[in-house]
């Protein structure tokens, strides 16, 4: 009961935290909802980059791949390896989901360092990487949660919920709490790392605007790629865990 009360208090605290804003934001009204316009703009740019790259890669496929086709086939093989390692032999249907997560986060993270967002002026706020906004990372984490629940229910039916009393019913509250901590850890890890990286670069550029920030930017690109890989790997691991039923 204490664990349940703690979970409710944690959710209430997160709801209150969602009302806290850092800096200024450019809002749009869509269907009665207020959304962050700059996040939608940058997300659409990232999606356009991914769709455009995919269209170019499959425009004229060759039996012996060269150039861009070779690169994209390597990326696909890499995503397949990650999915197979974490999910197992039934990884096939989940490759598109894991690949979409990885590529969207990867390009979003890199866009914060490589695209000149600052030159686009908004009435309020400024453009930045989509993953620099907690709303984006929480949405990605919730999609992952829906995916592993769907995977478990599809594979096992209602018997999937038996995992909550394994290995002993005493662990029921902890096993339930785990389903809240997974999306929290995914979202805050990604958001915190990307936000910290962009803040460090901004501070260094303002202090020493010539040479010093360049190594930090390269380090940021490396860590951004690692964060995308970590997110995709954990998403695949959670899906595999729900299908196998072990911790």
From Swiss-Prot:
It is a multi-pass membrane protein. Signal peptide: none annotated. PROSITE patterns: ATPASE_A. Coiled coil: none annotated. SUPFAM superfamilies: F1F0 ATP synthase subunit A. It holds the Pfam family ATP-synt_A. The chain crosses the membrane at residues 38-58, 95-115, 134-154, 199-219, 220-240. The keyword Nucleotide-binding does not apply. GO terms for molecular function: proton-transporting ATP synthase activity, rotational mechanism. GO terms for cellular component: chloroplast thylakoid membrane; plasma membrane; proton-transporting ATP synthase complex. Keywords: ATP synthesis, CF(0), Chloroplast, Hydrogen ion transport, Ion transport, Membrane, Plastid, Thylakoid, Transmembrane, Transmembrane helix, Transport. Key component of the proton channel; it plays a direct role in the translocation of protons across the membrane. It is found in: Plastid, Chloroplast thylakoid membrane. Belongs to the ATPase A chain family. This is ATP synthase subunit a, chloroplastic.
